[in-house]
């Protein structure tokens, strides 16, 4: 093996240097480039070491000789790099992403995202609309709206030709990715143009890119809407339809190991690195003991009153979470007593629902604190009056013709005064059975079909167990 180039490295900065970007060649040897998007891990196996033959590949010539400030030398073997896309490289003969999304486009379905002022409507494969509704004193409804993009209709022949071209090139082009919560996530783009003219861009038409992202439990929710440049938008949609395509499945990036062998006369690991880690352990020890003590207290005194975070932006599972491991009986009792509350929503506003108590809309800010709007409060008399004029429960027929309760609806009125129509806010809460492999999955969403009149949807497998207890007014009780 030929002599390699050497470069000095201070012990404490060793990790930074190795995880940086190396020159492409050392002493005539071409080395693989390192990327900040792919995680690496340093390992110190000692002088007697055999490169792994399974997993991420290595080549004998892909190495550098590193010399620390203490004149310790190490031969560091660099991986050929894995980015988590190995399965994608296999031949795929299934439907294209466009074909997988085709049922969504043919259903004429729309998704909604409600923010503090604007509501966004994405009718898949057709258009994107941004609007705000207001009612004047005379009950005349004023709508302020902008189309952020529309799909250009094509003749069947043009559409067929374009689809054929797309399928021919799709297997060879790079998959688009977007950084979502620190993870590079693949998406399928759908361009929409010919939106409402933009006065800030010489009346050019607004346009949008709809980014469809795989999520197995999603219901085509709108994850985000962003104006990336003036009158040009990005809309991120979560859908389960793309998950059948290997190139669009989300996978965490694998960790690529860099093996640094000590050369003759050098310790197994650099002395300065050992010293640094020892100092860090001394700092961590008191904190770790305190964390362990807090965790024990939390496990000992934890109750089922902890709110459930639904649609947290700390995950990419918008509108879906997993409830803590409780028995169904406990959960049902606490839910019906109103002491177990659901929290849901993404974006500026979040929502809190406590059964038989209230529905709140709130925003938390680290500087200004928590802003809460009462959307509706529970009063049995008001609900009973509402139930006389509206459908409090809906039925569905099973395969053997038996009718079972599909949804129940409850009225919560007397919310905070609406600035637009000077009427109290109100909300209809729809409780629905959710079939899921996880018995404790729950989905919460909110719609505003009319100004300050809301619909809150709550779906869970637990609700399946109590729907049939609903009386003629839709009121639930603990099942026998």
From Swiss-Prot:
InterPro entries on file: Man6P_isomerase_rcpt-bd_dom_sf, MRH_dom, OS-9-like, OS9-like_dom
This protein's record includes keyword Disulfide bond: yes
Functional note: Probable lectin that binds selectively to improperly folded lumenal proteins. May function in endoplasmic reticulum quality control and endoplasmic reticulum-associated degradation (ERAD) of both non-glycosylated proteins and glycoproteins.
Signal peptide range: 1-27
Gene3D superfamilies the UniProt entry points to: Mannose-6-phosphate receptor binding domain
Organism: Xenopus laevis
PROSITE patterns documented for this protein: MRH (PS51914)
Consequence of gene loss (knockout): Embryos display head and axial defects during organogenesis.
A GO cellular component annotation in the UniProt record: endoplasmic reticulum lumen
Localization, UniProt: Endoplasmic reticulum lumen
GO BP terms in the entry: endoplasmic reticulum unfolded protein response; ERAD pathway; retrograde protein transport, ER to cytosol
S-S pairs: 110-123, 198-231, 214-243, 341-354, 418-452, 433-464
Main localization of the protein described in the UniProt heading: endoplasmic reticulum
MRH domain: residues covered: 108-245, 339-466
Biased composition (Basic and acidic residues): 163-172
Protein name in the entry: Endoplasmic reticulum lectin 1
Region (Disordered): 152-172
UniProt keywords, alphabetically: Disulfide bond, Endoplasmic reticulum, Repeat, Signal
